Amino acid sequence: MKRKYSLTLLGSAIVLALPLSTQAESILANDMYGDVEKAVKSGEVIEKVFATQNHIATVTGPNISVHNTTKVSQYAIQANRLATDNGPSKVIIGDPSTGIVNIKTDFGNAIQSNHSNIEVYGKKISVEGISTALRSYSNYDEGSNIIIGSDSTESVSLSSVSDVETDGYGIYAEGINSKVNVLGKTIKVSASKTGEAQGAYEGIDAINGARVSIGSQNTSSLSVDGSVGMYVGEADSSVSLRAKNINIDAVEVGVWTQKAAQVSILGEQTNISAPQGILAYSNSKVTIDSDLIVSSEEAAIVARGHSSVTINSRNAKSTVINGDIVFMSTSPDGKSGNVIDADVSVNLNNENSIWTGRSYQTFKNNSGEMIEVVDLDNGNDYYGNVTGFYLKASNGGTWNVTGDSFVNDIEVADGASINMHSDTDVLNVDGLVVNNASVNMQGGENQKVSVNKLAARSASLNMKASTKDGKSIQTGQFEVLESVEEGSDLGVTLTGITSDDIQDAQAAMDSVKNTVVVKGATIEKTIVEGDLRGEITETTAADGSRSIAKTAENTKLLSMKGVNAAALVAWRDEVAYTNQRMEFLRDNSHAYGAWAQVYGGESAYDDASVDLTTTTVQVGADATIGDWVAGAAFSYMSGDADMSNGQADTDAYTLSLYASRMFDSGLFVNGLARYGRLSTDATAGNMDGSYDNNAFSVGGNVGYRITFAEQAFVEPMFGLQYAYVTGDDYKASNGVKVEQDDFDALIASLGVRTGFDFAKDAGKLYARASVNHDFLGEVDGKASKGGLAESMYVDLGGTWFTYGVGTQFNITDNLSVWGNVDRTTGGEVSTRYMMNAGLRYVF
């Protein structure tokens, strides 16, 4: 008859289901049977394996299944040492080449070692117990050792179920020299309970000096779960977890240590999820070196009794803590465990590192009620004070303070921040170091930060504020009680209000002179700019002297003015490039025809840090009308503006009509009329605006050409141009209404061009310079909102200078090209460079 078998997935291991007709046997190694070695076949089930009296029981086979079904035995595998034995006994199950190993008991402990040794090897190992999956106990010098798996093991599952009669443990190790070592690529340790069970069910329990090591650098995944993830207590007990990914999921407590016990967690990512994440009591020690997430509804860390908790001390990992950090003692007077002090070190090392929670002390008062205290000196000599709480946030790390808190020492650096939520009233700190980082007080006038010792470099303090009358400001308080490091500086920004809310800047600053008490530091207070008014600042020197309050120009309006000014100047100065076409006509008789040129450059309005880069394409055609050459041109200009607080796009379409005449005497005249349509889209801070302008200009030049040395020439000239641009009204996205006045410009230019002709009429090289003056040039307007108004005035009038060099080549009788580079200096808007390249072809 052919037997049938089935495979059932249990956790991360494979459980072999055997036919009921298979007869199970027990393997016993003792003085009666001696050492026993059993080779089993696949499908064969062993009832139990037992070694005692210093003997060894060995089971080998391709797959191994041990299943205890009798309540009398209370174990599936046991190695035992009697008091009269000479040494420990030993059980060996499988070897690294064994496939599936299933060990299960319907009653008691699946694997139990009493002062002896048990080793289980295989590719996939599953251990199921009703009370305990693994139990190791020792009080002898030789110890008790359980080894489960090897680096070649693919998966290990250790599980137990607590019922109405027993507690449940995934791993239970007790006693000095009691050791458990579990290896595998994936490891799962779990403890659960039946619905009626009232006892404990803990993933790992190591007490009285036992040592448990789970995982290695080759372990990819390790999970522990139970009502308590792990409990480690008494007499230097220890648990070590190592894997790439570690998950501890508990109903009550994730990690619980006390009485000089130690826990070490080393990995790439560790998640602890439990109402109470980490408990460290009575000289115990918890060290975590891993990207860490602690999610706790009650407390992420609870410590007391000179214990220590160290999280990512090497500053190489990210840390996320959701929950409070608590220093607690529940011991009344006259009882042990009263010392509340402990060393807790939390490092928030990067922008992904965030602690959201509060920190406080809690203990029983004289009436026996638990109270919460956030004072550095809690006033209770019996419990003492906490002195070892250290927090470091750097490289963008964040502490979100959710309630009244204290910390002994805080270091905040390199873009990190402390954010005090609105429901936090008090933060007490003994030593605070702030280096290029910020403290954000979001709670208003009831919030207070008290610091004993401060060292601040490029430190920012943001304080939520309010005002009812625009003259008096209500905000919280930041004070240093003992000492300030020499050279400290602090920038204080009052948030929640803007300069638009202030009627009297000096009175407003006077009202907050005592809200930041940091004697010996340089303090600059700032009220941020609004939509219309600029920021308000006041400086307090280290000696306590105060400057007067200053109101700056609004940067958004300044940028909007700058973009408008730069765009107007760019269009105004385009006239020079159409005039250059007429220069070409003077230089080359019969050069009329179709032509095109491309020019572009960069101009700057330095008062607002506006840089405008433009590119223009211009095409035209001209012909003779008697002794005159007349023509028309069309151009399109595209511009991009970069601002310190935004950006803008400009476009201009321009139609030009021109005429030029060269007299035999060397006198020349030309005239130019233009119409343009200008469009601008600009964003500065929270201000987005779009507007259009119509632009007109008319002008002309007169000059005289003097030729000498046969090929050299000089051309003094004078020009006059009038421009008119219609204003536009628009409403920006922040509600500011801008009303532009019409713009007029009357520009006179006095200049000279000089150069020499190449031989055989091949072209020429020239330089030019001019002085220009705008007799009008005032750009005016108004920005208004909510009863406030600010001027949009810019004066583009005055004098500036233009200079440049150029060249021209006549390639054939019909084809010519030219190019030049120009600069302007001295005006409100300066042209850093303008480059032009042109082509003329006669058909």
Residue spans for each PLM region:
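Extracellular beta-strand/loop-rich repeat segments of large surface/secreted proteins
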Residues: 308, 322, 327-510
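Outer membrane beta-barrel translocator domains of Type V secretion systems
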Residues: 553-717, 822, 827
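Membrane-embedded beta-strand positions of outer-membrane beta-barrel proteins
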Residues: 29, 40, 384, 594-598, ...
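Extracellular beta-strand/beta-solenoid scaffold signature
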Residues: 25-54, 65, 69-84, 88-90, ...
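Outer-envelope beta-barrel architecture signal
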Residues: 319, 353, 380, 590-594, ...
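Solvent-exposed, glycine/polar-rich loop segments of beta-barrel outer-membrane systems
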Residues: 608-613, 640, 644-646, 679-692, ...
